[in-house]
């Protein structure tokens, strides 16, 4: 993201410093010499961070099955509970970002994350404030130490194009980024 905050979570931390170093790859793919970045890839995890008063932008995987307006399998929701509860217990505000289905940058009512709110509240044990990305800043301002769920990020046209402006809008909402959605981490999305 090139974001102004620490990146923590399951997969990768954007390095604070980089320097290009030539590396001899031998005959790999017909390439004899290439340049790679030597980076400080030390891990930062939530349990080692000061979260008190911090807004923790947390990518989660809650792309769950729904029938007749109800979540039918809460497995993915159950998996995010420890992370969300840790943020809350540490005095932080978890701001959840997720996708649901494939709306391709269009608002599709049937793919709104609002349907997941009752299941999230039951699993986490606290109320969840649901908001659009456009109203997220105001919602977060009044949600200290509460859970905020932002509407389906794939409603945003730039999400699947890895739009830097969308990434910056998201980055501006948090002080810390946590990737708790390993299943979506490989995607080059905003």
What are the language-model segments listed below?
Residues 2-18:
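Intrinsically disordered, low-complexity segments enriched in serine/proline and basic residues
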Residues 6, 13, 24-38:
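Short, positively charged and aromatic/hydrophobic N-terminal segments
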Residues 32, 36-190:
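Active-site loop-to-helix "anion-binding N-cap" substructures in soluble metabolic enzymes
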């Amino acid at each position: 993201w090139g974001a102004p905050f620490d990146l923590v979570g399951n997969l990768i931390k954007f390095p604070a410093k980089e320097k290009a170093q030539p590396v001899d790859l031998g005959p790999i793919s017909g390439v004899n010499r290439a340049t790679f970045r030597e980076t400080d890839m030390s891990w930062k995890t939530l349990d080692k961070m000061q979260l008190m008063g911090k807004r923790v932008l947390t990518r989660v995987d809650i792309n769950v099955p729904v029938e007749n307006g109800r979540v039918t399998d809460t497995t993915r929701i159950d998996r995010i509970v420890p992370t969300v509860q840790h943020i809350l217990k540490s005095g932080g505000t978890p701001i959840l970002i997720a996708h649901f289905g494939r709306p391709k940058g269009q608002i599709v009512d049937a793919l709104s994350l609002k349907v997941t709110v009752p299941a999230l509240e039951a699993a986490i044990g606290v109320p969840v404030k649901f908001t659009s990305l456009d109203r997220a800043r105001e919602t977060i301002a009044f949600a200290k130490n509460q859970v905020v769920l932002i509407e389906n990020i794939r409603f945003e046209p730039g999400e699947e194009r890895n739009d830097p402006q969308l990434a910056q809008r998201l980055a501006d909402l948090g002080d810390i980024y946590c990737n708790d959605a390993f299943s979506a981490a490989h995607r080059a999305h905003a």
